Curated annotation (Swiss-Prot):
The lineage of its organism: Bacteria, Bacillati, Bacillota, Bacilli, Bacillales. GO terms for cellular component: cytosol; exodeoxyribonuclease VII complex. Keywords: Cytoplasm, Exonuclease, Hydrolase, Nuclease. The keyword Nuclease applies. Belongs to the XseB family. InterPro entries: Exonuc_VII_S (IPR003761), Exonuc_VII_ssu_sf (IPR037004). GO terms for molecular function: exodeoxyribonuclease VII activity. The keyword Cell inner membrane does not apply. It is an enzyme of class 3 (hydrolase). Its main location: cytoplasm. It is found in: Cytoplasm. This is Exodeoxyribonuclease 7 small subunit. Bidirectionally degrades single-stranded DNA into large acid-insoluble oligonucleotides, which are then degraded further into small acid-soluble oligonucleotides. Its EC number is 3.1.11.6.
Length: 76
């Protein structure tokens, strides 16, 4: 799975695969292929969400409050 997909692109592709599978007229081998691709997309989305969650934790700090921005060298 190409990691260059944005979260939105990956979700869109995942929704498309789910829609195809929900129709129920997909041959078994193709359904398995869609399922595998969907699992990869799901994993990619999960990784991207975890990355954002980590970034938000850094921005907000442990107490959930916004930290004041300090530029490099302004810590004096």
């Amino acid at each position: 799975m190409e990691n260059k997909l944005s979260f939105e692109e990956a979700i869109s592709q995942l929704e498309h695969l789910v829609s195809k599978l929900e129709q129920g007229d997909v041959p078994l081998e193709e359904a398995i292929s869609y399922f595998k691709e969907g699992m990869e997309l799901s994993k990619l989305c999960d990784e991207k969400l975890k990355d954002v969650q980590e970034q938000m934790a850094v921005i907000l700090g442990e107490d959930g409050e916004l930290k004041p921005f300090t530029a490099l060298g302004d810590e004096a």
